[in-house]
Amino acid sequence: MGDAGVSIEVFVDLDSRAEEMLAQGQEMFTWIPNAYVKYPCTHEGLRAAEMSVQKSIRVNMTLCFSQEQAAAVYAATRGSKEPVYISPFVGRLDDQGEDGMDLVRNIKKMYERSDGHVHVLAASIRTVNHLLCSFFLGAELATVPSKVLQEWTAAGFPMPDQDFLYKGVDAKGKPLKPIAYKNLDLNLPWESFDLAHELTTKGIQKFVADYQSTLRRSA
């Protein structure tokens, strides 16, 4: 819903270089007039994003699992003439016992003192509560599976009020571990931030496995 563009993901593995990603991104950006090229929140992905925005290519930085990655995305894309999207993956953090909505909260808080060129796209939304909390925290965008949209519709399209309280719990009702806010300097070079995160690595590996599986099925 809405007019936020369509994200097209470049093929990457753990050995992909920024120049390879950029070459794919330049081609993909010509496919449709509202394209956003998806790069991962890795060192090479940030290099590709930095070069892309200099060429006025819109980008969506995916597989974000840390506030440091979000700070690096801001710094690497400073000066972009178009909104830059960053996609924190809520559900996958929940899966490992951490409160994924805290990451969205922390990124939004950090960006309060920014120039506003990076927009938060809440990703890996699993529940209506995830969706409502995304609204409450002010995420500009969200990727939502049809099941959650249907549940939200059936509930009458509720929206969070000022007293909305989100409690992060796992499937068994056990509280999720909070993710603490960090005071990070957005004026630092993007290379100074620690981009490493296990879930980003696993996300790339899963993408490669899914891609190869699709190729085998279509052969």
Spans of features found by a protein language model:
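Active-site beta->alpha loop and helix N-cap motifs at the rims of alpha/beta catalytic domains
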Residues: 1-54, 58
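A residue-level signal for conserved active-site and pocket-lining positions in enzyme catalytic cores
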Residues: 37, 134, 207
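Structural signal for hydrophobic packing residues in well-ordered secondary-structure cores
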Residues: 1, 29-32, 108-111, 115, ...
